[in-house]
Swiss-Prot record:
Gene, per the UniProt record: panC
Lineage: Bacteria, Bacillati, Bacillota, Clostridia, Eubacteriales
Uppermost EC category: ligase
Biological role stated in the UniProt entry: Catalyzes the condensation of pantoate with beta-alanine in an ATP-dependent reaction via a pantoyl-adenylate intermediate.
Protein name: Pantothenate synthetase
Record: active site: 37 (proton donor)
Organism: Clostridium botulinum (strain Langeland / NCTC 10281 / Type F)
Length: 281
């Protein structure tokens, strides 16, 4: 397994692979890898000749009061996981390699970024789309693998790839959970023992909403109330948003008539966690 830090070097390797007509599966990450990332890598390994994982904590997708400086990093552990699951190349550039000068060019995806995390984290998806555009241009993958836990990100990236004619297939992979239901996340490392226990309220509240939908509830306000009521029973939980949106357009819906995304963002202590599920009539 190669670990490469420069655009020049990684392009030389990729040119060789492309000359040999090899397919490339790409998993973009910010590192501190867990079983969720491993599931993406395994899927990429199954479907491609070569697998690349990028590890880069992207500064331009963090707001001024967010956790860029404290985001967990552990390249040794990450490298071990990548090697275990058959990654061919880790691309781990320095910030100065990706952004050697002040960046004037940004990628925005309208409409899909108006709600959910896009509303609560201004500039976040501009940063995500800009860095992924750079990675797609540098790495030239055949397929890219993203987790469904970041459902809005997945929808936004799919639309960006479609609109800008990237010759890349975007593959969404299911949420991976702990045995007690908590969605796997690098930010779970921030939680102390009590917060970790309290964080289970996210999945529990979504389960209640899912049960109501399966029992025939079609009013989105009622579904939202079920989730809010459950979350409010947890003293350490502070709601950032609870949204029921169309799963394609990500626009709010009042009456549930087609496929919807039920998405929540909740602070447990100082840690912001997200979770979701999709429901189809």
């Amino acid at each position: 397994m190669n670990i490469v830090n420069t655009i020049k070097d990684v392009r030389l390797i990729i040119k060789k692979w492309k000359d040999e007509n090899l397919s490339i599966g790409y998993v973009p990450t910010m590192g501190y890898l867990h079983e969720g990332h491993a599931s993406l890598i395994k899927k990429a390994r199954e479907e491609n000749d070569k697998v690349i994982v990028s590890i880069f904590v992207n500064p331009i997708q963090f707001g001024p009061k967010e956790d860029y400086s404290t985001y967990p990093r552990d390249l040794v552990k990450d490298s071990s996981l990548c090697e275990k699951f058959g990654v061919d190349l880790i691309f781990n550039p320095e910030t100065s390699e990706m952004y050697p000068n002040k960046i004037y060019s940004h990628i925005n995806v309208d409409i899909l970024t108006e709600n959910l995390c896009g509303e609560k984290r201004p500039g976040h998806f501009q940063g995500v789309c800009t860095v992924l555009t750079k990675f797609f241009n540098i790495l030239n993958p055949t397929k890219a693998y993203l987790g469904e836990k970041d459902a809005q990100q997945l929808a936004v990236v799919r639309k960006m790839v479609e609109d800008l004619n990237f010759p890349i297939e975007i593959i969404g992979c299911p949420i991976i959970r702990e045995e007690d239901g908590l969605a796997k996340s690098s930010r779970n490392a921030y939680l102390n023992k009590q917060e970790r226990k309290s964080a289970l309220i996210l999945n529990k509240s979504l389960k209640e909403a899912q049960n109501a939908l399966e029992s025939g509830e079609k009013n989105s306000n009622n579904i939202r109330d079920i989730i809010v009521s459950k979350l409010n029973k947890e003293p350490l939980a502070k709601i950032d948003y609870v949204s029921i949106v169309d799963s394609i357009t990500l626009q709010s819906v009042k009456k549930i008539q087609s496929s919807i995304l039920v998405a929540i963002a909740v602070y447990i202590g100082k840690t912001r966690l997200i979770d979701n599920f999709t429901f189809k009539l």
